[in-house]
Amino acid sequence: MSINWIKITERAREGIKIINALPYETFTTVLFYTHRQMSPSVASASATSSTVGTSVTTTGRVDSSTEENPTSNTEPEYTLEELERLVGVPRQDFLLLIKTFSYILRRISTFIIKPSLLQRELREKLQLEDEAKIDAILRLWVRETTPIMNNLASKRYESNVIEDVAWKLNMEISSHCQQREKTPLAVLQMKTAVGEDINIEMTQPELMELYNQFESIQGELDAMLAMKTTGATAPGNQ
């Protein structure tokens, strides 16, 4: 079974080819760098900084503790320029590499699916060739989604009904490498019955996909309700 969680464009396919060509250690370095840049704390710091020298930690294939904590301060750090030299590809390919990593991580962060299914999608749909690289992405994804799933399973969410929904529009700079490129982001602001604020940030395609998913869910609910109504009024049930 394939799910519609990501669209692979020609540019994305070219970026994936670059990913496949990277040595494993370089791959994990770029993976964790991109992940750190997408985290709220780093993004906030980047917005107030005029320098490009953002650091990233490296990891090795053998050191499992590093992969569990990719931002460990005991590991060597690289600036963006040093990372570009480490990757060793032309600048345009390096920019495409960062954007492809960012695209993949952003898309998998918006879906909660079985790890085995995501593993198959990374292998078959994205055509990642190295199983170790696929496993590294999976471990990072599991580490990020586990707290979310634990929170959803906690008792305090059982009656946590959404009572209010609002929205606003933000503009963000897409990367350090292309300061002039800005992306409009829709922010859905929801308030629960217990007073908790939930903010979800999405691009226009992601917002459209969310809308289509809601439409699909509503269609299935309507169909189930129609079947239930038909069954209740059938001659055999009277």
Swiss-Prot record:
Subunit structure: Component of the commander complex consisting of the CCC subcomplex and the retriever subcomplex. Component of the CCC subcomplex. Interacts with Smn; along with Sbat and Hez may form an accessory subcomplex involved in SMN complex function.
Function: Scaffold protein in the commander complex that is essential for endosomal recycling of transmembrane cargos; the commander complex is composed of the CCC subcomplex and the retriever subcomplex. May modulate activity of cullin-RING E3 ubiquitin ligase (CRL) complexes. May down-regulate activation of NF-kappa-B. May have an accessory function in the survival motor neuron (SMN) complex. Required for neuromuscular function and organismal viability.
Positions with biased composition (Low complexity): 43-77
Other known facts: 'Valette' is named after a Grand Master of the Order of Malta and distinguished warrior, Jean Parisot de Valette.
Organism for this UniProt entry: Drosophila melanogaster (Fruit fly)
Family listed: Belongs to the COMM domain-containing protein 10 family.
Superkingdom per UniProt: Eukaryota
GO BP annotation list: motor behavior
InterPro entries: COMM, COMMD10
Domain (COMM) ranges: 161-225
Protein name: COMM domain-containing protein 10 homolog Vlet
Signal peptide limits: none
Chain positions covered by the region annotation Disordered: 43-78
Gene disruption: observed consequences: RNAi-mediated knockdown is adult lethal. Conditional RNAi-mediated knockdown in muscle cells is also adult lethal; adults show severe mobility defects, reduced flight capacity and don't survive beyond day 5 post eclosion. Conditional RNAi-mediated knockdown in neurons or specifically in motor neurons reduces adult viability.
Pfam families on file: COMM_domain
